[in-house]
């Protein structure tokens, strides 16, 4: 069943409270593993650059291409048991976030959707940054840096 597979879409939060970046895969069933409080990857915001985040995002998208929702859930539970308690779901993380992005691929573009981190706007969509799929990873990292500029 195709709907049971994880989409090639990743949510990226900059967690201001804990000074971390969180990457979450999204799926077609529950709009994202973050609903379950299962983060896929976390990075220290002070020491992680945009190029590293792009490589990790593309790696996570590759992982999502072949894994089913059930398998991924079991894998994430095993890998992140201690971290599950940190955030029980996306609302708490969204409140603490100073950046909320969704990164995904279309047939011919690499896209970053930028959402508001202001409490009164509750994650409202702002705009999309696009690059051709043929672009270099450096160009993808520049696009991510451009997205972070929105939050300054």
Predicted segments, located by residue:
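Intrinsically disordered, low-complexity regulatory segments enriched in Ser/Thr/Pro
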Residues: 2, 7-51, 105-142, 150
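Negatively charged, low-complexity tracts enriched in Asp/Glu with abundant Ser/Thr
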Residues: 1-4, 44-99, 119-127
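Short, surface-exposed beta-edge/turn micro-motifs
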Residues: 9, 99-100
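Residue-level detector of alpha-helical secondary structure
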Residues: 58, 81, 141, 145-148
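Residue-level detector of solvent-exposed, low-hydrophobicity positions
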Residues: 28-29, 87, 94, 147
């Amino acid at each position: 069943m195709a709907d049971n597979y994880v989409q090639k879409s990743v949510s990226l939060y900059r967690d201001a409270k804990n000074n971390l970046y969180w990457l979450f895969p999204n799926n077609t069933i529950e709009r994202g593993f973050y609903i379950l409080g299962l983060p896929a990857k976390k990075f220290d915001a002070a020491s992680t650059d945009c190029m590293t985040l792009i490589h990790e995002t593309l790696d996570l998208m590759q992982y999502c291409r072949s894994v089913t929702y059930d398998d991924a859930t079991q894998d994430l539970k095993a890998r992140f048991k201690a971290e599950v308690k940190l955030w029980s779901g996306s609302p708490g993380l969204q409140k603490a976030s100073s950046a909320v992005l969704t990164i995904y691929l279309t047939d011919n573009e690499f896209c970053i959707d930028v959402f508001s981190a202001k409490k009164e706007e509750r994650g409202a969509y702002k705009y999309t940054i696009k690059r051709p799929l043929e672009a270099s990873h450096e160009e993808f990292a520049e696009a991510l840096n451009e997205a972070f500029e929105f939050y300054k």
